[in-house]
């Protein structure tokens, strides 16, 4: 599949970089069929795309922006681009992004009434627990604002289960499938999302019930911080072995303006409660045991490290210079960073590997595009497209609006 993606990308790149108008009407330059055939042969018979993907996911592994892992992966990518003969391969700084973070050690277990390891993972930028915590957990089962009073004085130093059990539905069909031509045509012809409606992106307007749930969740987080909980456990999204683990929560009262709020990445961010996501199947079991009155006891240890000496991040950049139209640039790129709890294979080492393989093939064949082809491997995507936006702002145009 990645070989096919590379072949498609290369066809478009060569078309744009050589001056061939893709799908245009009227006179146009002819395709260099010999070059296309060479690209296909190199890509299908001598592909390195899976080796690139394997290295990124197996050796550096998770590539959280600001972490030692992503810096090692970026240096490797820059070195490979240079080895392949790309010009001006470098790490281009942007930021400030904020402090880096890495997980140094972690364990989580049910120890009473019987032993069982828990499938769980700390959230990014969570502090550590300063050693092993062993205690009976507190189930923070506040379903209304009035319920919060029942937990005053009970959360200090506690391991807290943040919310109720989440329903896990049975899967009777495969979660993934290959799209047919009819499916793709239907997607292509679909009406664009209406702002404020379903699928309307940032203009989506929550319902009254959703706003109430968000307000209650905020009050719970503020209470956890104020009371001094020792650790928060949350049910993970996903099921059947899939967990989604993102950034730790730093809650602010609603009356604090957004521009006055820190993020967990900020060097001077206020202290927060250590936070761990638990696989929903294991989390639900803990809730059921507590509701049955079982003497549940947990043992958790979280060890993390922050890196605040250098608050900048970087993108990996390299290019194949053009000839007579070298001042015109054809960009290809993919986000290089990932979250920390997996190896970031599909999101997005796959895309990064395809882009790297595309420029490798062009260099290997010695093709001379008219326009400059530039590759960008972006960081900070998972925190809001930060790296690519910084690059566009620096080299092309400032973004208008929020």
Name what the model sees in each region.
Residues 24-26, 193-206, 211, 239:
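Disordered, low-complexity segments in secreted/periplasmic proteins that are enriched in proline
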Residues 26-35, 54, 58-197, 257:
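Noncatalytic luminal/extracellular "stalk/propeptide" segments of secretory-pathway proteins
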Residues 36-43, 59-69, 135-141, 149-150, ...:
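Second-shell loop/turn segments in exported
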Residues 51, 59, 361-386, 402:
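Short helix-loop-beta-strand segments that form the rim/entrance of peptidase-like active sites
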Residues 171-189, 234-279, 309:
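Surface-exposed loop and adjacent secondary-structure segments within mature catalytic domains
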